[in-house]
A protein has these predicted regions:
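Soluble "head" domains of membrane/secretory-pathway proteins
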Residues: 1-194
């Protein structure tokens, strides 16, 4: 993005940026700003997402208030008024009406909004979408980390993946190599040959 830390430093100077924003404590190796919406696991943890539920070290995690999922909304054939969606904080441009359903295959919203939508007179059904393998789109494994066809993972059924802690060793195999090869070569700057 053009509005990142490095752009601010170039425009305002290092000293001003340091005073205005404080010192940089962590800087990504790739020097890109990263957006972390919610950190659910850290070094030393094993992360698993099963049917949309997050597990860390085998323990189910509480859903955060306001967490969004995607929902299928079946209507009587009429679309929901875009002003109504907008007033609920749902971006109408992210809601695709499908007359064949009839309704919407995917509306991103939280559970409270899903309950409100279910109460609308034109709505006959609201159900949370859970991605399972094989997903609707065949390239799914190539769109999610570790970007390998060997991992039949989706957004809602992901892992388990072990996140190594500092100083720990991981036994590498051809099966788990896609999980760790980028870390080893790009971030730890070690050569890796198979």
């Amino acid at each position: 993005p053009t509005d990142d830390y490095y752009t601010h430093v170039r425009l305002n100077g290092r000293e001003y940026s340091k005073k205005a924003y404080g010192p940089v404590i962590v800087r990504p190796v790739d020097k890109k700003d990263n957006y972390v919406k919610r950190c659910v696991a850290i070094a030393g943890d094993t992360l698993l997402v099963h049917d949309g539920k997050v597990y860390v070290n085998g323990i189910a995690q509480e859903n955060y208030p306001g967490i969004q999922n995607t929902y299928t909304v079946v209507t009587n054939g009429s679309p929901i008024n875009s002003k109504v969606l907008d007033e609920m904080g749902i971006n109408p441009q992210e809601c695709w009406f499908d007359a064949a359903l009839p309704g919407y295959r995917s509306i991103p919203m939280n559970e409270d909004d899903a309950k409100k939508v279910a109460q609308m007179g034109i709505v006959s059904e609201v159900r949370q979408n859970i991605d399972v393998y094989p997903p609707d789109y065949p390239d799914s494994p190539l769109m999610l980390f570790p970007f390998s066809e060997n991992f039949k993972w989706t957004r809602d059924n992901y892992g388990p993946i072990y996140i190594p802690a500092k100083g720990e060793s991981v036994d590498l195999t051809l099966e788990n190599l896609p999980l760790y090869e980028r870390i080893i070569s790009n971030y730890e700057k070690n050569s890796l040959e198979v």
